[in-house]
Amino acid sequence: MAAQRKKRLSRTEKNNALLAQAAAVKVPSVADVVVVGGGASGLTAAISAAEALQDAKHPGTVVVFERALECGRTILATGGGRCNFANEDVRPENYRHPAFVRSVVGGKYLKEVLSFFRTCGLAWITEDEGRMYPVTREASSVRDVLLTRAKKAGVILACAREIVDIQTTSQ
């Protein structure tokens, strides 16, 4: 018996499936850490927060709110769809405001970025001008390792939700 081909979903069917998946996520009304935006920076921030809570043996809730139907969609467009996730030649003097870049990036930027992605299980190559890409040359590889690590860390991914207001409480 010939193997059946898997039916490819239309864009509408895929979006409906993602919307149903997003609606099924239970979002707490109170969280220890809320990250608005589920792109690369938001996912990385949420992972770092969730793992810090775990390391401190402090049970906590980390939630990422993403307006789109799925987290990490913006990653897919970076680097021409290949995701240039780092550059081995990041020097503050290459930027318009080197002092600002130095204060944000610091001296350990590349080492920390590569350590983070190595821990995620991402393998990469370095191409011309120091651009670093996943060995698959597919941006989805970067998105997938970030989503996997976020879920492993217990991050709640609340997609298809737009934030209008956040209230803070002191503890």
Task: For the regions a language model picked out, list residue spans one by one.
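A short, basic/flexible loop-to-alpha-helix module at the beginning of a structural domain
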Residues: 2-3, 11-30
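Beta1/beta-strand and adjacent pyrophosphate-binding region of the FAD-binding site
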Residues: 25-41, 63
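Glycine-rich FAD pyrophosphate-binding loop
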Residues: 34, 50-80
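Small-residue (primarily alanine) positions within well-ordered alpha-helices
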Residues: 41, 45-50
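General beta-strand structural signal in soluble alpha/beta enzymes
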Residues: 66, 126, 157-159
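Glycine-rich active-site loop/strand segments that organize a redox cofactor
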Residues: 79-129
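Short beta-strand to alpha-helix junction loop
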Residues: 101-109, 129-148, 158
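A conserved short coil-to-beta-strand element within the FAD-binding core of flavoproteins
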Residues: 159-170
